[in-house]
């Protein structure tokens, strides 16, 4: 089944060029199917690029997915036209009384910013508190993982001395876990973060189950036993060129970044990179939609089962 989006969203034409089945809202109204309602809180600066990445992954499920985009930062964006935000994004007040099957909270380039210095930190806390009673399952990505661990579990910000950037190998810990069903025993995924996620920290201070980690003991994928919250510390949604764009941006800014690990062929930034994580990213999102959202969400969202404690 396709994803459902507003007719004029730029991602419609972009994804159709990749043979992705996108159904405009005007056509979807003629189908007697209860789609999954998924809300995306997009915290990334280049919002259109991020929309394309997540919509691509959501589109590969056999389930029909109705996507709504949420913003909580009222400041003028330097990377996304205000017309786009006004046309395709809702504010929290627009949806605070609604229920959703799923919520995705994206990453954000805030790894070196203290939580209380984040301009929209109060709004982040508000959304996470609201989600306990209004969302069946929430998926946190990269920086959002760090924010959620602080808000939900009181874990202080853990920061690496150097940025972790590259494509790293991970291994699954529970072969029969639903979120990793169909995963290879070892798989690759991109990372781009200052945030640090030692697996020992997650085990010692939360009741979350770690499902995949690196050989160095960094947690990559973990979730609550009731499937209400899931965390992925990398960026499985990234395009093949995203890490390269970040690298060259930092080079131009005079930051002397390290070449992303295991990314450029022959470790040469002049050779175009290839994505080695695409199948993993697709399977992760299919599993989340199926086992963490579809299998446990009520048919009538008015019968949402609160609350996440």
From Swiss-Prot:
Keyword set, alphabetical order: Acyltransferase, Amino-acid biosynthesis, Cytoplasm, Methionine biosynthesis, Transferase
GO cellular component terms attached to this protein's record: cytoplasm
Pathways per UniProt: Amino-acid biosynthesis; L-methionine biosynthesis via de novo pathway; O-succinyl-L-homoserine from L-homoserine: step 1/1
Main location per the UniProt record: cytoplasm
Signal peptide positions (record): none
Spans through the membrane: none
MF term (GO), any: homoserine O-succinyltransferase activity
Site (Important for acyl-CoA specificity): 111
Binding annotation for substrate: 163, 192, 249
Family in the record: Belongs to the MetA family.
Protein name in UniProt: Homoserine O-succinyltransferase
Protein source organism: Enterobacter sp. (strain 638)
Organismal lineage: Bacteria, Pseudomonadati, Pseudomonadota, Gammaproteobacteria, Enterobacterales
């Amino acid at each position: 089944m396709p994803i459902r989006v507003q007719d004029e969203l730029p991602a419609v034409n972009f994804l159709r060029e990749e043979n992705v089945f996108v159904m405009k809202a005007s056509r979807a109204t003629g189908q007697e199917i209860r789609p999954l309602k998924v809300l995306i809180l997009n915290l990334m600066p280049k919002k259109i690029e991020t929309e394309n990445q997540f919509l691509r992954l959501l589109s590969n499920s056999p389930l029909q997915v109705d996507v709504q985009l949420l913003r909580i930062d009222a400041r003028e964006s330097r990377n996304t036209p205000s017309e786009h935000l006004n046309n395709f994004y809702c504010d929290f007040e627009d949806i605070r009384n609604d229920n959703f099957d799923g919520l995705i909270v994206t990453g954000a380039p805030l790894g070196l910013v203290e939580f209380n210095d984040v301009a929209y930190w109060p709004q982040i806390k508000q959304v996470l508190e609201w989600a306990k009673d209004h969302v069946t399952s929430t998926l946190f990505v990269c920086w959002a993982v760090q924010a959620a661990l602080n808000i939900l579990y009181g874990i202080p910000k853990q920061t690496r001395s150097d940025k972790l950037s590259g494509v790293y190998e991970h291994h699954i810990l529970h072969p029969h876990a639903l979120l990793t069903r169909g995963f290879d025993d070892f798989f690759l995924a991109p990372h781009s973060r200052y945030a640090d996620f030692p697996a020992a920290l997650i085990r010692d201070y939360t009741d979350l189950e770690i499902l995949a980690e690196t050989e160095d003991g960094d947690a990559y994928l973990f979730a609550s036993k009731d499937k209400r919250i899931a965390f992925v510390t990398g960026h499985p949604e990234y395009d093949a060129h995203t890490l390269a764009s970040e690298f060259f941006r930092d080079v131009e800014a005079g930051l002397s970044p390290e070449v992303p690990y295991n990314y450029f062929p022959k470790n040469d930034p002049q050779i175009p990179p290839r994505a080695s994580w695409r199948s993993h990213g697709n399977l992760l999102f299919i599993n989340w939609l199926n086992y963490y959202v579809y299998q446990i969400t009520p048919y009538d969202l008015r019968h949402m089962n609160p609350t996440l404690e």
